[in-house]
Amino acid sequence: MMKKAYIPALLVLLSLLTLCGCHGSRGQNAFSVPDSFDESRQYEITFCAKNDTNKTQVDIYNKAITDFQALYPNISVKLRLYTDYGKIYNDVITNIATNTTPNVCITYPDHIATYLTGSNVVAPLDGLFADERYGLGGSALKYDGPAMEEIIPQFLEECSFSGSHYAVPFMRSTEACYVNKTYVEAL
């Protein structure tokens, strides 16, 4: 699967959140998957992402948004860039009370766990994943979206809290430890 399809896939999956206005404030009704997607209605999605001044990364985000908006002209995506994940976290936490949190953000699972301490702040994605039309691999998607079986189960499990999924693992960092065997044996 081409990497450029990941961000639009994430955006369209999570764009459904705006159909019910569920994007992170305390006391909102619990999220439910809409029966249909009204393409005549205008929607605006705020997408928060980390960028540490990497122009290539910004260009990829902008191209993904442009491509997505060409497919879904009734959805406007507002990109908000941050220099580190901590700033995204602080902004989301601060804006929960004012109902101005983003619809979509790239964040860590432990940050999501903190957001979940509020009532209906983060929408569970299981219903969206399973939606035959707009879910993972959905028939009505206007792009080649990933199917559930194309996502590594262990990565997806890290996005689960109390039996529900709250994130999509389209981006992963791999940590490794390299050891110089010669130096270790010399110790």
Q: Across the structure, where does each feature detected by a protein language model lie?
A:
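Bacterial N-terminal signal peptides
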Residues: L10-T18
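Short beta-strand->loop
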Residues: A49-D52, A167-R172, N180, L187
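Short, well-ordered alpha-helical scaffold segment located
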Residues: H111, T182-Y183
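Extracytoplasmic/periplasmic substrate-binding proteins
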Residues: Q57, E185-L187
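Conserved N-terminal structural module of periplasmic/extracytoplasmic solute-binding proteins
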Residues: C22-V121, D131, L136-L141, G145
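Positively charged n-region of N-terminal signal peptides that target proteins for export
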Residues: M1-A5
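Short polybasic/polar patches that bind polyanions
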Residues: T18, A70, E185
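Hinge/lid segment of periplasmic solute-binding proteins
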Residues: D110-A176
